[in-house]
């Protein structure tokens, strides 16, 4: 009896598509999603009791590993004091202070419950601050599911072949300019034509929602120069990359100081927590100090804050990122070697604890490159690995994640399985 099949059928009777986030449905890879019963360290177990080495990591938050004892204890202690108050707590001050120490660009910070809330409010704030309407985003970048940002977005939209979402009125998106990632000429043209009307530019500073796409140094430099020149707000959406690619996020690797930053995933330690922050003059436009409204009943939830504070403490320990980066590089290099030996066209890339796998000769620079990759090849690889106890995200457009719980020996075991799978694909 396959419990995953039984639960999927049961779920579809009460939940649209049987899942609460589209990519989980295995729609782009086929098959039955694994219903997870428990997780610990680098492993998850499904309802059949099958153990998998996990490279999804809850889509990024599980940077210290699942069910880390110190995080669990912090959550337990916080829960004993109450689950939610709808009032300020010392913990939310503490986590804001910690983030500000790590990210100097964050002079003021507001906690919310999801990455979508963070990006949605950052856009509203940029518009309120500048008095302008137009925004620039990039094709294939995903910034949550708020209406103005669901235009040629990444993540689940790409997974299901939908460039934009139904149900979003044209009036909501007419002010959204969509450009090609890493295309400086398009960026310059957009500012030349509409510079006085552009409120902000938002981007994933390493795109994790069309696999892993790196920005060129010239591209991020042009972004900063053009936004400063035209008085537009530069928003780094670090919901995925923040504290994942480096302690200080992508902005610390780029040497760029954005005006606003959105963050989530890692800062909640596996609990629902996100934030947006940045320049004091912009952030003080938010209510109750300014006229830009934002609120949330569960914002700064004490349980989520406790998990986040403990996670931030762990990742700041000596050698954490050096080890995380080394393990991730070990994984992608092993995959490249295995694919090459089997004669499979494949490459891989990584930054910090985040990686991308591409069934193509070269790593993509934009959405068009990623769309030309061998998606069918990824499907074969995904199922070959899953059948052998290794779990990746069920979409060719999603980045993968390594945690501190992934040991060198475990990485070697994963690579050995990949050798088998690549050989089988080449047969």
Swiss-Prot record:
Which InterPro entries does UniProt cross-reference here? 4pyrrol_synth_GluAld_NH2Trfase, Aminotrans_3, Aminotrans_3_PPA_site, PyrdxlP-dep_Trfase, PyrdxlP-dep_Trfase_major, PyrdxlP-dep_Trfase_small
E.C. code: 5.4.3.8
**UniProt GO MF annotations:** glutamate-1-semialdehyde 2,1-aminomutase activity; pyridoxal phosphate binding; transaminase activity
Q: Does the keyword Cytoplasm apply?
A: yes
**Biological processes, Gene Ontology terms:** protoporphyrinogen IX biosynthetic process
Which cofactor names does the annotation list? pyridoxal 5'-phosphate
EC class name:
isomerase
In the UniProt record, the signal sequence range is none
**Pathway, per record:** Porphyrin-containing compound metabolism; protoporphyrin-IX biosynthesis; 5-aminolevulinate from L-glutamyl-tRNA(Glu): step 2/2
Entry GO terms, CC? cytoplasm
Q: Does the keyword Isomerase apply?
A: yes
Compartments reported by the entry? Cytoplasm
What does the annotation say about its assembly with partners? Homodimer.
Q: Which HAMAP family match?
A: HemL_aminotrans_3 (MF_00375)
Record's family? Answer: Belongs to the class-III pyridoxal-phosphate-dependent aminotransferase family. HemL subfamily.
Name this polypeptide is given:
Glutamate-1-semialdehyde 2,1-aminomutase
* Organism in which the protein naturally occurs: Neisseria meningitidis serogroup A / serotype 4A (strain DSM 15465 / Z2491)
From the broadest rank down, the organism's phylogenetic lineage runs: Bacteria, Pseudomonadati, Pseudomonadota, Betaproteobacteria, Neisseriales
What gene makes this protein? hemL
